[in-house]
Amino acid sequence: MAGHSKWANIKHKKAAADAKRGKIWTRLIKEIQVAARLGGGDVNSNPRLRLAVDKAADANMPKDNVKRAIDRGVGGADGANYEEIRYEGYGISGAAIIVDTLTDNRTRTVAEVRHAFSKFGGNMGTDGSVAFMFDHVGQFLFAPGTSEDALMEAALEAGANDVNTNDDGSIEVLCDWQAFSAVKDALEAAGFKAELAEVTMKPQNEVEFTGDDAAKMQKLLDALENLDDVQDVYTNAVIVEE
């Protein structure tokens, strides 16, 4: 992507994630419970559970914690009343934002999400108001210096749809979200370990923010991320660090 470093953004994202690992574990436990409740406790026949368990491994969550979460989900304890709700809205300058939640109290959650938007210069939108600006995909990012030709060959053979080299030298691989686990396994078997591997809502176009606007936008994103019921926040805003 011209104008900003995809690699710097990913490193910042990983550092932020490491700083709040306890919160990430809490979110993953909820996701594992819900996935197991809806699709069963076998990762081989439950793609959503497989994805959640892989995320837990990447976050260094102990296997005992993962097993307990699966058992609770299958048994119907805890998590049984969690409801998946997506909220859409806008940040400053009309930046698009998607907020995915798992909640046992939608009245509380919508109030908290709306408050975060309004407090930091954004506003809630209606269902579908910004989702069309994103694609639901599997995304992998590899460090600058990775062999582009070898990675492209392995990725396309694994079932990826697209391979892009960014201006900073990092390489992005995209696939259908349903094929994420299969592509991830194939790439790792070929010797390619991604620095970032996730199923995400990828914006079709990005909007860069600098200076004061970047600081304001970051505050809004942080406020949404820090809500207990929020699982993921997606945006087409790119915060450019100067």
UniProtKB/Swiss-Prot annotation:
Gene3D superfamilies in UniProt: 1.10.10.200, 3.30.70.980
Keywords: Cytoplasm, DNA-binding, Transcription, Transcription regulation
An individual GO BP term: regulation of DNA-templated transcription
Main location: cytoplasm
Pfam families (alphabetical): TACO1_YebC_N, Transcrip_reg
Source organism, top-level taxon: Bacteria
InterPro entries associated with the record: Integrase-like_N (IPR017856), TACO1_YebC-like_2nd/3rd_dom (IPR048300), TACO1_YebC_N (IPR049083), Transcrip_reg_TACO1-like (IPR002876), Transcrip_reg_TACO1-like_dom3 (IPR026564), YebC-like (IPR029072)
Transmembrane segments: none
Keyword DNA-binding: yes
Keyword Cytoplasm part of the UniProt annotation: yes
Localization, UniProt: Cytoplasm
GO CC, one annotated term: cytosol
GO MF annotation terms: DNA binding
NCBIfam families: PRK00110.1, PRK12378.1, YebC/PmpR family DNA-binding transcriptional regulator
The family this protein is said to belong to: Belongs to the TACO1 family.
HAMAP family referenced in this protein's UniProt entry, alphabetically: Transcrip_reg_TACO1
Protein's name in the database: Probable transcriptional regulatory protein Bcen2424_2294
